[in-house]
Every structure is written in C-alpha cells, then in structure tokens.
Amino acid sequence: MWDPGAYELRENTGTSGLEQTARAAVRALADRDIPHLVAGGLAVQEHGYHRVTLDVDLVVPDILEAVEFLTADLSGPFVRVAGVEDRVQDRRNGVFVDLLPAGKVLRRGCQVPFPEPVEVSETPKFVSLEQLISLKLDSWSNNPVRRLKDKVDVIELIQARHLPRELNIAAPVRQHYVETWDALEAEH
C-alpha cells in the first residue's frame, strides 16, 4: 500500500524506521507462515490521515507464537521487551512492535474484535478502512479521555477521505460513527 503522503510524513518527521520495522516484522512472520494485519497509527497514515505515530501495531492469530518467532534469531532485529509479553523492539532503530490478538477485543469493555488475518505475506497488509474506524471508535468509546486520539483519527479520516455516512462500520460502534459524521456535516 504505502501511501505517498504517509511516506513523506515519515521521512520528514524522522519516523521512517517504522516502515523498516514493519517490513522486517512481516517478513519474519511470513517465514513462519503467520498471517498479519497492520492496525493502529500506521494504518491511519496509510488510509489517508497523515499524523505521526511511533510504533507498529500488528494483528496476529497467536501473540506468544509471534513474539517467539520474531525474537528467535538472537542476531535478528527484534528483542523482547522485559515485562511486556505482547511487545518486541527493533534493536536497529528502537521502534516498538505491539502484537494484537486476532479475533479478540483489546480490553474488557470493548466490543469490536480485531479482524482475523488470513493472508501470509512478506509485504505489510493493512486492516480495511472500515475495520480501522470500527476499532478506533471502540477504543475511544471505552476510554473516552485517554483514547481521545482514536476519535480524532476517525474525524480526520472522515474529512480526508470524504467518507459517506453509510459506511460498513461494526454494529456496536456504528451509532458513534453516524453521530460523528452528522456533527461534522452540521459544521459545514
């Protein structure tokens, strides 16, 4: 995918290591036949809202297996993060990779599970725009103060992509999307 605007943002903000890390992680997972999906801020960039992010979020079927395979080569780029079982770090540039549970929700109270990746690929595959917005609204609605940036991501994606009111958003958060869309439309 690699949106040109997202690429330019990473180059101009000194965060180009994100792409290097994402590519290395998905190649390592593909070598072990593990499918993945990129979510989080990197997916937000690639879907058209060019904002800074500092980590890579990967949805995988089995977090512990993915951590094991990513860190198995002691001379490879990835090392475990002490005390955090779902995160590795790229020793070349310090970028963290957070591994997210396919088919499960992030935390208690959330209602939108992460999508199930099916394709094994050596190149990054991203969650769909609809999935991304659904996940962002779910995160925000369960922690509205601390996860305000997730709501902002949705607002900015609606504006940047000129999204329609009727979008295939997950049922538990569809009303949040419609309310946000309506509020933006009312401000025009």
Q: For the regions a protein language model found, what residue spans apply to each?
A:
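Compositionally biased terminal segments of proteins
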Residues: 1-188
